[in-house]
Each structure stands twice: as C-alpha cells, then as structure tokens.
Design a protein with these regions (language model features):
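Structured-RNA-binding interfaces characteristic of tRNA pseudouridine synthases
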Residues: 1-124
Length: 124
C-alpha cells in the first residue's frame, strides 16, 4: 500500500503475476544486443551485454526486480522493467518484447520510474 514516507524509495505498482514476469525476464538472459534498451547520451562503445540473472520475486509487501550482468547501459533496467510491465498490462505483446530484445524493432521507449532503483553490488 502507498506510503508517502516510502515514495522516494519505491515505485508503487499494483500486484502482478510474478510467474509470468519471470517468464518474460528470462528472455533477457544471455548475450544480447540491447540497443533498444538504452537511453541516448551514453558513452558505451557497444550495446552488447550479457545478462546472468533477470528475475522478480516477492519480499514482504514488495515485488523486487533483480538483474545481474557484465555491465549495464544507460536506462537499461528502467526500459527493461517498463517493457515487462507493459506486457503484463496487455499494452505490448510477448512477441514484441522478444523482437525488441532481439534488436529487431523498438516497441517501448518509456522508462519505469527511478524510485526504488539502486545498484546493490559491483563485482570484478
């Protein structure tokens, strides 16, 4: 439930099907050209990234999205989460999500809000 004290730290979103979200997040795992999952203005030499983990899980009253990769592009996670949520809302098809992940065509260019997004660990 909404709390003004948490508003800066979480994005309030209605409950969704975590099983389906994980199925969709599984499409991101592996080596991918994520050119349609980055904002312009980054200084990356390449948009190729390897995603090791992309999953969603429940923790207390929260739904957590967890990504682990060999690097991230500017806006990548916010675009990825927004795209998954659009499929869950029925505003984008699973096929369109797959095509965007396969760098064939961009269907979603909207970002999920930054509230609650944080980098938890850097591994070398």
């Amino acid at each position: 439930s909404y709390s003004p004290f948490m508003a800066s730290y979480v994005h309030f979103y209605p409950k969704f099907d975590l099983g389906k979200a994980n199925e969709l997040l599984g499409f991101f795992v592996g080596k991918k050209d994520l050119k349609f999952f980055c904002k312009s203005g980054g200084d990356n030499k390449t948009t190729l990234r390897e995603i090791f983990i992309a999953r969603a899980y429940a923790y207390k009253d929260f739904s957590i999205f967890h990504f682990k990769a060999n690097g991230f592009l500017r806006g990548q996670i916010r675009l990825s989460v927004a795209s998954v949520l659009k499929v869950l809302e029925g505003k984008m098809s699973e096929k369109e999500l797959k095509e965007q992940i396969e760098a064939k065509k961009q269907y979603n260019h909207f970002l999920a809000p930054p509230n609650g997004l944080y980098l938890s660990r850097i591994c070398y």
